[in-house]
Amino acid sequence: MVMRVGLLGLGTVGSGTAKILLDPAHRHPLVGQIELARVGVRSLDKPRSVAIEGDRLTTDLESIVADPTIDVVVEVMGGLEPARSLILKAIAHGKHVVTANKAVIARYGDEIFTAANEAGIYVMLEAAVAGGIPVIQPLKQALGVNRIRAVTGIINGTTNYILTRMQREGGDFESILADAQRLGYAEADPSADVDGLDAADKIAILASLAFGGRIKLSEVYSEGIRHVTTADIAYADRLGFVIKLLAIARRDGEFDETSDQSLDQLQLRVHPTLVPVSHPLASVNDVYNAILIEGDPIGQVMFFGPGAGEGPTASAVVSDLLNLAANLRAGTTPKATNPLLACSHQHYCKVSPMADIVSRFYVRLLAEDEPGVIGKLGLCFGRHQVSLESIVQIGQHETRAEIVIVSHEVTESNFQTALDELREYREIHSVASVLRVL
């Protein structure tokens, strides 16, 4: 039984997907049973890296999603519209969907999966998170017997590349960002990457799968790396840390063994973090991604690999097609989707406000270089139940001392209240940097 595919988009990922489907030799035999039937593009005249016969190409994307001979629609166009509308129309016409579009899934997943579940349709999204790293299906299947406690990841290659080079070379953010743009690792408008928005989309998807509930993207805290300086990276190194942009989804509290649903709250946050050099994620460098999953009884397992690019992302797209082809050959009936492939949860996860999050903190500040300042800092933190691991004068700028503080675990609200008080002190010139510590 041949499965006919309509491909929407023939850019980097679309071209990579087409190359695999048109060259099935020495791959799984089922790849040869997947036919690239039609390809939708914006322009027929654009030069492309893959040769597609003219009768397969069309600029009429809606005709593909409505074509009764198409079994699966692959959406790799990117952007929110018309991608969202075309996915919904494909579902309405009874087509299964494979997408690499994390922005659409993170924002419109409710609408899309509700429609898919009602229609008995699969929406597959292995390529939407971390490119070539196979993590979506393991979360649904191999790790499904575990009670997941946390998902922590480096899931944006652009920011990891920038921070890695800042660490190695001591270069500043702006100059390395410009290099990343020239090399194609960063977009002309890098905001989604460097401001943490891309990672927020991805951790929302991973959290939904890991914790079995829907996620409101607006409840994911996101903070980027623009304010990370070479001074912070150097001081972190002296303290035994590296700075990484981490995406964190963590379950607060214990499991309720009387219920099949966990009603406790989740932490959902993206921010630059001081990571101990001994931690598995500390050695993930350049454009590589990694996702560390903690669960019971498995303990810790980490997925590592390329997070983007034509080959890795296309591999993930075709892996979803392979799963669909195998499932359709097995003959599941309409309205009875395989629960290990479908996303059928309906309830929303409860998300803890940032004020309630417990974390360690790193602070760098400039203060007047005079007796009693460090003691005054310690007293202020103590009044707000902030216990300090270390407080040291690490440098000097003219008449001002540069002081670095690392706290023990404390609630975000208590720590920020202490900082607000410090900023009012005559002796404190500025709070130059505040970062969380893993």
Identify the residue ranges that each predicted region occupies:
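N-terminal glycine-/serine-/threonine-rich beta1-alpha1-beta2 phosphate-ribose binding loop
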Residues: 1-93
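Short, ordered loop/turn segments at secondary-structure junctions
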Residues: 42-44, 78, 102-104, 110, ...
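Rossmann-fold NAD(P)-binding glycine/threonine-rich loop
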Residues: 83-93, 102-140
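A short hydrophobic/small-residue beta-strand
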Residues: 96-98, 388
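Rossmann-like NAD(P)H-binding beta-loop-alpha module
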Residues: 117-198, 205
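Substrate-binding/catalytic subdomain of NAD(P)-dependent oxidoreductase enzymes
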Residues: 175-283, 287-290
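Glycine-rich phosphate/pyrophosphate-binding beta-alpha loops
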Residues: 277, 301, 305-311
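A conserved regulatory-domain signal marking ACT and ACT-like small-molecule sensing domains
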Residues: 316, 321, 325-438
